[in-house]
């Protein structure tokens, strides 16, 4: 199986810290060592090979801004849904998962993972078809959060929603019409929040499975938000409802 390339100091640092299998770290020639001291120290501690390479090689591998650092790592693995449910049952307190219905932009997924980590979301569920996967671009956009938030890839979102309901989750769909203001969202239950695709929103089969619908009110001339922005607002609203000011 071919290595996956990740780039950027945050993504590489988190991959090392979390123990993700790393074949090699590539450092740009001439980069100031004080900028990557933590990466170099952790790599040495874990006996990871560090190789200095020309900037042109990093440019070729990354095809994106790389901050002078890249790593060749084992491909990202998806969490198993059944195992995920088993692990969640062992936790105390209310749970939150995101269901991304047809999201295709890797930058959006990376940004969502970053906010999911910040707000303590327990997992993110994506479908196997017509969806972004875990890639180098997602890893960099997540600034390392990809190492901390379980991503579950499933064949059938509608069936997965049924299983979540059987395990005590209430499912909230995001919808522009006939929906409750998200600021009135009740968060005193385990929640699965569905975010639709950038262009089409939720699919009908998924929408029909939702227990209720929430919307983000807008007063401007553009009547939609980027999927990662909408997801972030939802995640932080749940976080706000469950944590008092000053608690964290």
Curated annotation (Swiss-Prot):
Coiled coil: none annotated. Disulfide bonds: none annotated. GO terms for biological process: methylation; RNA processing. InterPro entries: Alpha/beta_knot_MTases, Ribosomal_eL30-like_sf, rRNA_MeTrfase_TrmH, SpoU_MeTrfase, SpoU_subst-bd, tRNA_m1G_MTases_N. It comes from the Bacteria. Pfam families: SpoU_methylase (PF00588), SpoU_sub_bind (PF08032). Its EC number is 2.1.1.-. S-adenosyl-L-methionine binds at residues 196, 216, 225. CDD domains: SpoU-like_RlmB. GO terms for cellular component: cytosol. SUPFAM superfamilies: alpha/beta knot, L30e-like. Keywords: Methyltransferase, Transferase. Belongs to the class IV-like SAM-binding methyltransferase superfamily. RNA methyltransferase TrmH family. This is Putative TrmH family tRNA/rRNA methyltransferase.
